[in-house]
Protein backbone atom coordinates (compact mmCIF):
# COMPACT_ATOMS: atom_id res chain seq x y z
CA UNK A 1 0.00 0.00 0.00
CA UNK A 2 2.83 2.38 0.88
CA UNK A 3 4.44 1.66 -2.48
CA UNK A 4 1.25 2.59 -4.32
CA UNK A 5 0.95 5.84 -2.37
CA UNK A 6 4.57 6.70 -3.14
CA UNK A 7 4.07 5.96 -6.84
CA UNK A 8 0.95 8.12 -6.88
CA UNK A 9 2.79 11.05 -5.29
CA UNK A 10 5.64 10.71 -7.80
CA UNK A 11 3.22 10.55 -10.72
CA UNK A 12 1.35 13.66 -9.58
CA UNK A 13 4.68 15.48 -9.24
CA UNK A 14 5.78 14.52 -12.75
CA UNK A 15 2.48 15.60 -14.29
CA UNK A 16 2.62 18.93 -12.45
CA UNK A 17 6.17 19.56 -13.61
CA UNK A 18 5.31 18.76 -17.24
CA UNK A 19 2.32 21.12 -17.10
CA UNK A 20 4.53 23.89 -15.70
CA UNK A 21 7.01 23.48 -18.56
CA UNK A 22 4.17 23.68 -21.07
CA UNK A 23 2.90 26.89 -19.48
CA UNK A 24 6.34 28.50 -19.77
CA UNK A 25 6.75 27.39 -23.39
CA UNK A 26 3.33 28.72 -24.37
CA UNK A 27 3.48 32.07 -22.56
CA UNK A 28 2.56 34.77 -25.04
CA UNK A 29 1.44 38.33 -24.61
CA UNK A 30 -1.43 38.85 -27.04
CA UNK A 31 -2.93 42.25 -27.69
CA UNK A 32 -6.62 42.90 -27.33
CA UNK A 33 -6.91 43.89 -31.02
CA UNK A 34 -10.03 42.36 -32.49
CA UNK A 35 -9.02 40.98 -35.86
CA UNK A 36 -10.99 37.73 -35.90
CA UNK A 37 -9.65 34.62 -37.56
CA UNK A 38 -11.38 31.32 -38.17
CA UNK A 39 -9.38 28.38 -36.88
CA UNK A 40 -9.12 25.00 -38.55
CA UNK A 41 -11.06 23.68 -35.55
CA UNK A 42 -14.13 25.71 -36.57
CA UNK A 43 -13.80 28.27 -33.74
CA UNK A 44 -13.46 32.02 -34.12
CA UNK A 45 -10.48 33.56 -32.30
CA UNK A 46 -10.11 37.28 -31.54
CA UNK A 47 -6.76 37.37 -33.35
CA UNK A 48 -3.99 35.12 -34.67
CA UNK A 49 -1.95 35.39 -31.45
CA UNK A 50 -4.85 34.02 -29.40
CA UNK A 51 -5.25 31.14 -31.84
CA UNK A 52 -1.53 30.32 -31.63
CA UNK A 53 -1.56 30.48 -27.84
CA UNK A 54 -4.62 28.23 -27.61
CA UNK A 55 -3.05 25.71 -29.99
CA UNK A 56 0.13 25.62 -27.90
CA UNK A 57 -1.64 25.24 -24.55
CA UNK A 58 -3.94 22.49 -25.86
CA UNK A 59 -1.08 20.79 -27.73
CA UNK A 60 -3.19 20.69 -30.88
CA UNK A 61 -2.43 21.76 -34.41
CA UNK A 62 -4.79 24.66 -35.08
CA UNK A 63 -4.16 26.84 -38.11
CA UNK A 64 -5.87 29.90 -39.55
CA UNK A 65 -8.53 28.61 -41.94
CA UNK A 66 -9.45 32.12 -43.10
CA UNK A 67 -9.56 35.71 -41.87
CA UNK A 68 -12.81 36.81 -40.27
CA UNK A 69 -15.33 34.94 -38.17
CA UNK A 70 -16.19 31.30 -38.86
Curated annotation (Swiss-Prot):
Subcellular location: Secreted
Disulfide bonds: 26-56, 30-49, 38-70
GO biological process, one term: cell differentiation
Any Pfam family the entry gives: Kazal_1
CDD domains: KAZAL_FS
Organ and tissue specificity: Expressed by the venom duct.
Signal peptide range in chain numbering: 1-20
PROSITE patterns on file: KAZAL_2
GO cellular component terms, A-Z: extracellular region
One example GO MF annotation: toxin activity
Organism domain of life: Eukaryota
Kazal-like domain sequence ranges: 21-70
Keywords: Disulfide bond, Ion channel impairing toxin, Neurotoxin, Protease inhibitor, Secreted, Serine protease inhibitor, Signal, Toxin
Site (Reactive bond): 32-33
Swiss-Prot/TrEMBL domain comment: The cysteine framework is IX (C-C-C-C-C-C).
Role played: Acts as a neurotoxin by inhibiting an ion channel. May also act as a serine protease inhibitor, since it possess the kazal serine protease inhibitor signature.
Family in the record: Belongs to the conopeptide P-like superfamily.
Protein name in UniProt: Turripeptide Gsg9.2
Organism: Gemmula sogodensis
